[in-house]
């Protein structure tokens, strides 16, 4: 599906960029691709990636999605875009909400506008469960990013560029996530700091995240949102699973919730469940393509949203201790950390 095509990955030196490049290299997909462009701000990470991958088809572009000219330059001749650039640390965005706005909203608008002007065929926008019923600056900014993408899709139904959104749950062992924190605390013989023991989070692997984006790329229509069905765990069970894997006697210390944290996350709202299509491992939420002339739609009717339940980390499949251990042991990151323990 990428034969002789040029791909652009914004925020390409991050967890998703590394994971999707690893997939393309491992499965020899890259031999059919014309070019992959990595667009990001950090020249050191780009240099490290360039040396590690050493592939002439992977090109590097220094720039910032906040700067329209830099993303527009990188977009010339691009066929497909994976938009992963974001500020994603919840407490940081609570203290610096304007920075979240500048990157996650205005930066996303720059990407979407450049893609439209440069006649990119398809854009996959990476979002988060925190965009559903958001209570923090990061989630609010991502929710508005989704709204920008869907609005572009609604206005461009007949245009060349297709816009789709993917929503992630917690991506295990991604940069800034809790698993690397717990492992570092175990190795340094420190207490494992847990915010709230009964707090639940969806558990996705980086492999799952790539699967979701590629599924949306292959099957997504204009304005679709895709969600992968994922199991969940409490934070306490996750910490105890890592204790067991690393044979750790570290104490667990409860420190209370951080700024902007939710007790559980939602991947699909009850309003969205009214129109969601169950695709087995995924939900597809089609765009509401109506215009502002509502009178002509009144005869259609609608499911009673009040009777539907949103899809959350509280009502999805809850993993027990042994199941979480098994899931963690399948992660390359955990295997590497075990070797170095």
From Swiss-Prot:
Q: Tell me if Isomerase is a UniProt keyword of this record.
A: yes
**UniProt GO MF annotations:** UDP-glucose 4-epimerase activity
Going by the UniProt record, its keywords in alphabetical order are: Isomerase, Lipopolysaccharide biosynthesis
EC number annotated for this UniProt entry: 5.1.3.2
Q: Does the keyword section mention ATP-binding? A: no
Q: Know the name of this protein?
A: UDP-glucose 4-epimerase
Q: Name one Pfam family in it.
A: Polysacc_synt_2
Q: Which reaction does it catalyse?
A: UDP-alpha-D-glucose = UDP-alpha-D-galactose
Question: Function, please?
Answer: Epimerizes UDP-galactose to UDP-glucose.
Out of the domains of life, which is the source? Bacteria
Q: What is the lineage of its organism?
A: Bacteria, Pseudomonadati, Pseudomonadota, Alphaproteobacteria, Rickettsiales
User: Which family, according to the similarity comment?
Assistant: Belongs to the polysaccharide synthase family.
Organism, as annotated: Rickettsia bellii (strain RML369-C)
State any GO BP term from the record: lipopolysaccharide biosynthetic process
């Amino acid at each position: 599906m990428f034969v002789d095509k040029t791909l652009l990955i914004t925020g390409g030196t991050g967890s998703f960029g590394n994971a999707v490049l690893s997939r393309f290299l491992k499965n020899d997909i890259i031999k059919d691709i014309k070019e992959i462009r990595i667009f990001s701000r950090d020249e050191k990470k780009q240099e490290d990636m360039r040396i590690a991958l050493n592939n002439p088809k992977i090109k590097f572009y220094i720039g910032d999605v906040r700067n329209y000219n830099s993303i527009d330059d990188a977009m010339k001749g691009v066929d497909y875009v994976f938009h992963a650039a974001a500020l994603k640390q919840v407490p940081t965005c609570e203290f610096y909400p304007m920075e979240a706005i500048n990157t996650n909203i205005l930066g996303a608008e720059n990407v979407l506008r450049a893609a439209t002007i440069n006649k990119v065929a398809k854009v996959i926008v990476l979002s988060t469960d925190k965009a559903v019923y958001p209570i923090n600056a990061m989630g609010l900014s991502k929710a508005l990013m989704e709204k920008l993408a869907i609005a572009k899709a609604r206005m461009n139904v007949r245009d060349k560029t297709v816009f789709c959104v993917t929503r992630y749950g917690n991506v295990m062992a991604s940069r800034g996530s809790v698993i690397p924190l717990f492992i570092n605390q175990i190795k340094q013989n420190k207490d494992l700091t847990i915010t709230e023991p009964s707090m639940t989070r969806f558990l996705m692997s980086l492999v799952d995240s790539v699967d979701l984006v590629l599924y949306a790329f292959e099957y997504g229509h204009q304005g679709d949102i895709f969600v992968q069905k994922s199991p969940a765990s409490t934070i306490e069970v996750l910490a105890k699973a890592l204790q067991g894997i690393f044979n750790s006697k570290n104490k667990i210390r409860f420190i209370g919730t951080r700024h902007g944290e939710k007790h559980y996350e939602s991947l699909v709202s009850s309003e969205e469940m009214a129109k969601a299509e169950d695709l087995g491992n995924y939900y597809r939420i089609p765009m509401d393509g109506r215009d502002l002339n509502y009178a002509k739609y009144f005869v259609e009717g609608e499911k009673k949203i009040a009777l539907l339940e949103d899809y959350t980390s509280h009502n999805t499949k809850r993993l027990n201790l042994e199941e979480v251990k098994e899931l963690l042991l399948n992660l390359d990151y955990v295997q590497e950390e075990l070797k170095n323990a």
